[in-house]
Amino acid sequence: MLNPGFPLIFAALLCFFFKSRKIRYLFTFGALIISLVLMLTLPRNKILAAASFLDMELILNYISLSSRNIGIIFSLFALLVLIYGYRLLSLASLNLLNIFVGSSIAILFVGDFISFFFFWELITVAAFFLVYDKMKEKLRYIAEYYIIIHVLGGLSLLFGIILNYNYTGNIILTPPEAGLVFFIFGIAIKIGFLGFHAWIPKTYAAIPFQLAVLMAAYTSKVGVYALYRIVELETNLIAYLGLLNALGGILLAIFHSHLRIIISYSIISQIGYMLVGIGLTNNIAVTGGIFHLINHILYKGLLFMMAGTIFYSTGFENLTDLGNLWKKTPVTFLAGIIATLSIAGFPFFNGYLSKALIKAGLDSQLLYYGLQLAGVGTSLIFIKVLYFAFLCKNNNPDIIKIPPLSMRLGMLLISAFMMLTAWNPAGIERLFQITPAVDYFSGSSIFSGIMPFLIALLLFPLLKKYISPHPEKVFQRDFFMKLGYSFINLDKKISRIHSGDLIRYLSWSLLALLILLMVFLLAG
Amino acid sequence: MHLPILLIIIPLFTVFSLGLFAFFSKKYIIPLVLTSSLLSTVIIFFFIFNRETKLPFSYNLGSWQPDLAINIIVDHYTLVIFAAMGLITLLSVIYSLTEITRNKAKFYLLLNVLFVGTAGMVMTADLFNLYVFFEITSISSYALVAYNDKDISLEAAFKYLMLGTVSAVFLLLAIILTYMATGTLNMVLIPERLGNLPVLTRQILIAFYLIGLGVKFAIVPLHTWLPDAYVGVPITYNVLSSALIIKTQFFVLMRILYIFFGLNFLQNNMISTILLVWGIFSMLFGHAAAFQQNNLKRLLGYSTIAQMGYVIIAFSLGTPAGILAGSFHMINHGIMKGAIFFAAGNLHKAAGSYQLDKMQGMADIMPKTSLIFVLILLSMVGIPPLSGFASKWLILEASLEAGYLLPAFMIILGSFLSLGYYLSIIINIYTGEKNFSDNLPVGVAGLKINEIIPAAVLTAVCIVLGFYPAVLTGLIARAPEFLLQQLNFINIIIGG
């Protein structure tokens, strides 16, 4: 049977022949529905499609519970983005969206490393063209940066794959027995692990906001899925690294004031939560990690939608220029509140359930208090956003464009879905077929859910002057770019020795002969 | 069956007839050239399709005794070059039909001389003939480089001539030394007689062979003629050079090394290691130098040097998997480079220059050609599902299987470096229309069909090979047998 991601890729191919926007939308919608149906109906834990490449057997369709759950949320979210971006997505980006989302979904259902690598790179290439803009120089360079860093990760993954293949002789997607370092390096870039995270804020803060909504949901989550499938350590190292990520992401985010940069850094922090979940060995925490991934896509999407709508209606994205918007954009404000409370893990909001699950699975006090601290930080960040964007009266930006109905509808739909899941844990458990033995609404877990938010609310007036907004540039050089530039300087030297002088060239070839002869004479 | 010798005779006959036709009636030149390359291609495909029944095949000129006669051999290893020839020659002749506008007779004459030389080098089993065909190839190459009569092409041709001649001296020296040591020039007799020589003598012989042919397949630092030569020549020559001629020279060197000296000698006396390290150096150097280039052709020239590095690495592993991977990449790189050069030629029609900054905005004018460009560049980096991934996978697998971890890592690193400069091409082509807003360049009206076909066909092949690399690996599956085991080669003519 068909891999659930393939309908989208076929739709992308079909779309090339139709220039009409409506038809392309129709194809995309149809493909997403088909893939949802496939995911819900196909039998699990069975090889459903295979192919061969050279002398290797590829497993093209193998559905496990976690991949099914992530896949469902991937296609649901794509539907929501299509609604939100109905008036914004360009004709070309619809095609690329199909390939991007299609390969993100397809990668979840393959069972071997070759096809895994194939879709891994396809995601990168599709994202490159999504980011790329012929007319804008900045976007051209960001796209270049994006693809270079991701291909670096991809090649590292490839090296790991081939080391493992050479060692074990098979390419089945299981925790590798050799070359684990290269797998981890490749995945770390994809998930934007602390230190490799620079592409996240760069990309998501600069591209058109409707694309940021889309892209932010997939790339790093695919990385988390890969980590879950591939990396299996004896220790809880990943969980502690995840904690580091959760706290580091907050430190990075809190001092920024560009809306989408803040949200991007907070992705890093939220990824940390997921890593804590899947890095632990017990079932509850792992389920919680995957569940958090699902929730995260929803509320992070909503946050990006909120930021996008603010930008669309006021033309500003930096908190220094915003303020007093709550009356002018009530729907956006509502979405902002729901998203903030969800990301903060406030009880009866979307993020609460998965955070409670992760906390229930923790086995050390350090992790528990670390995550609570991260919760305080997260709450603080988004209280800051809400305050400076909607409530504070310093600025009073005008509404230059009323956001179209589709954007508001998209935000309302996603908020409604989030609230539905938050109020109906039994339903969500049925949809995702998870059965944790955790009482979500016991007194202690509600208390530990409320705590961080309350602390943050109390701290905010005290810390306000330290984290108040300031103007900033979106694109800054980082370590990787400096490395690149130093390499280019080396290149210039190499280029310069090619002077075009014939005598020099002749002497090079004679020198080569001489060295060869010397090697033979001396070694012999 | 006289088919193999026809591969030499047909272009040779074309050369002489071209002279006559150029004198009497010019309108027959094109049909003649097309017919002759079509015939050659048919012969090549005959061998490719009947490889199981007809090969290995030896042809004895003049029916002398096998050990005295000049022999021509077509075995499974020869198929590697045949595959490239079958795909590239006809397509490049087709492409040249509109590219060459003046002095057609001269151009096709030189081109056919080149075909004579390459076909001869690939098939001959006689060292002296090898040298003759080597010189035929070289001299026609020098002339073709100078063909455009521009300052830059004349200067490049002069440099190429100088470097080529110096290297040819070493090749000749090596052949003479071999003859003095063994008393024969028959390639099947040399192996056992060379075995008695002291190790050092054999090593020095190898050094001479390496330098002599190394200039031609552009191993760093003997590569210096290549980027210069590529700038001022017709696209047809660019394609033929990087897809066929360079490969042929390397092919011959490998045959000499593995057949004459044997795998054990090469591995026990550092030759394999030297080649391996040299290949890595060549690859990294080529990638690094390509970064700074503004001229598209020069950049692709450096990229060819780097890609040859991969081939050298693969071949120097000395395992069947390595030879197979190297052969695969040789053919595959020919396909990719062919496609990209044809596409570059098409872009040049509209842009009027090969400078990257002058090519800005071409994507708006030629969307399909630009798409081909992007596809092939991604393939060169090794991004699936294009054929570049298959060859990179094969090389990596082979080198790890042979226990070489570092070379494999370097290949990964090299691929990463190559992404940097390939991206700069893409970004230049896909920059918004700024140069062409007021004066649209000439030639936008449309490409002729013969300019579209070659690039399209090769791109299609590249995509198909990406999904089904087994098509090509099946074709060359037995190539390693005839390279790594001397006896297989020797038995084609004597014994067996």
List the model feature ranges, each with a label:
Chain A
Residues 1-6, 10-95, 170-172, 434, ...:
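Transmembrane helix-loop-helix hairpins at membrane boundaries of multipass inner-membrane proteins
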Residues 336-341, 406-423, 483-489, 511-512:
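Hydrophobic membrane-spanning alpha-helices of multi-pass integral membrane proteins
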Residues 416, 427-524:
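Aromatic-capped, Gly/Pro-kinked transmembrane alpha-helices
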Residues 56-58, 320, 396-397, 489-500:
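Cytosolic juxtamembrane amphipathic/interface segments immediately preceding
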Residues 21-31, 142-147, 151, 327-334, ...:
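Alpha-helical transmembrane segments and their helix-start/interface "positive-inside/aromatic belt" motifs
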Residues 41-50, 163-169, 343-358, 420-437:
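Membrane-helix interface motif
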Residues 54-69, 176-180, 360-370, 439-444:
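Short aromatic-rich membrane-water interface segments that cap or initiate transmembrane helices
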Residues 80-116, 125-398, 403:
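Hydrophobic transmembrane alpha-helices and their helix-loop junctions in integral membrane proteins
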